[in-house]
Amino acid sequence: MAKRTARVKRRERKNVDKGVAHIRSTFNNTIVTITDVHGNALAWATAGAMGFKGSRKSTPFAAQMAAEKAAKDAMEHGVREVEVLVKGPGSGREAAIRQLQAAGLEVTAIKDVTPIPHNGCRPPKRRRV
């Protein structure tokens, strides 16, 4: 059998000027996804994918690095303005927003979209250390 040569899939460059930055900040990790206004992902980064492991993933610095990488990748697609949607209780929320601004993206709006139950599921039992 003849060996197939591996084809390198090149990312096509989309021309999008406005985007939405979704920041999901949990107690363990921070996920930054930048999409177009329809919700199609343009760029993403996580604290874990940046090389942070264990408890270092949950630091504001790790969130900062993830936001910087996502912003740089999105700017390659032409994104200049972002609306920020923040979800979750983690420590990387503010750091990620500040880094998006520092990377050169113009933040037009910041919304907190953390889901709050109207007394839904019973929460897990409290930790005793």
Curated annotation (Swiss-Prot):
PROSITE patterns cross-referenced by the UniProt entry: RIBOSOMAL_S11
Domain of life, per lineage: Bacteria
Gene Ontology biological process: translation
GO cellular component, one term: ribonucleoprotein complex
Keywords per UniProt: Ribonucleoprotein, Ribosomal protein, RNA-binding, rRNA-binding
Any GO MF annotation of the entry: structural constituent of ribosome
Entries under NCBIfam families matching the protein: PRK05309.1 (NF003698), uS11_bact (TIGR03632)
Function: Located on the platform of the 30S subunit, it bridges several disparate RNA helices of the 16S rRNA. Forms part of the Shine-Dalgarno cleft in the 70S ribosome.
Family: Belongs to the universal ribosomal protein uS11 family.
Subunit note: Part of the 30S ribosomal subunit. Interacts with proteins S7 and S18. Binds to IF-3.
Name of the molecule in the record: Small ribosomal subunit protein uS11
Organism expressing this protein natively: Symbiobacterium thermophilum (strain DSM 24528 / JCM 14929 / IAM 14863 / T)
Record gene name: rpsK
